[in-house]
């Protein structure tokens, strides 16, 4: 599956950071992680750091799938508002999922500090804007729901929103628990640290093409006919997992993004806040460490790569128009535009944990607008699953829900 197209900003900015060899021999490991994007790198960092003998394989170069196309806003907010999620999955599961998102962003901040390498991580506020009067009623209800659950939020009136941020909206929820990151560089940093300090092994251009199981082991055959014998497998294959599972667990769409030219004297409110609104599909934006603005959205309900690619330019103009309406006093010049695949689940929660059709195997599928945050949650969830420890999120995020 072609996961991205156009000039993905993170790849253009960073180039190929590290390359790894393809697998050229039969190997044995404790845990095989299939997928070397941001999810696979987070899980590999966690498990190798706990002493497991971990191998990561990726059919591309590390993080050249959807990881280098994501806009990498880090949000605790889930695509399904809290008050609606409570109706779908219950108060405890919904509230726990939101609060764990906050904890995950702080966890990543500590992890980045531990590695000591720049990946563009910046803690930011998050501003969720009502774009019309009807959505303001829903957003007001969402504010009350979050506030009643002890989440630190502030309500901004239309006047406050304009006065503080020059944003055109009817009102907004302001949260202190957001961030942004260069996800492509972060993934490379995680893998480099784990290979250097924890003995992680990584193989690029190595595709798993066949899987066999017995009562004790998993046997994975690669496209070059080498064998990987693993006690456990973790699938971190993102949207391509749809081709592996018979279950219809996600609807795939196309999403678009543009990054501006660098902005001299970028306003502080743009550098320290991420924004998104209540439109469907919603508009979202963030700044980068080199003073650009990334604008994303304009989703389409298909994922055919040829069709998606054919309208990148058109979608770029649409995003610029949407940005102009959202922040009319700010003028930006687009530099690069690109497209990627985006998925949504029935309840906007991820699928993390075992699957009945895959013995001794686990999936970390952080679908949705805050997929990176879900993947950070997956670090502890998969660690607990492998060790036989209980974890309530294994129940919340299971396939059979």
Question: What are the residue ranges of the model-derived segments?
Answer:
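Extreme N-terminal leader/targeting segments of oxidoreductases
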Residues: 1-31
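Flavin (FAD/FMN) cofactor-binding and adjacent substrate-gating region
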Residues: 2-13, 80-86, 110-189
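N-terminal Rossmann-like FAD-binding beta1-loop-alpha1 element of flavoenzymes
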Residues: 27-56
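Glycine-rich FAD pyrophosphate-binding loop
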Residues: 49-69
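Glycine-rich active-site loop/strand segments that organize a redox cofactor
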Residues: 70-100
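Active-site substrate-recognition segment that forms the wall
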Residues: 106, 114-122, 208-213, 226-357
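Helical element adjacent to the flavin cofactor pocket in flavoenzyme catalytic cores
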Residues: 172-231
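C-terminal catalytic lobe of FAD-dependent flavoproteins
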Residues: 309, 324-401
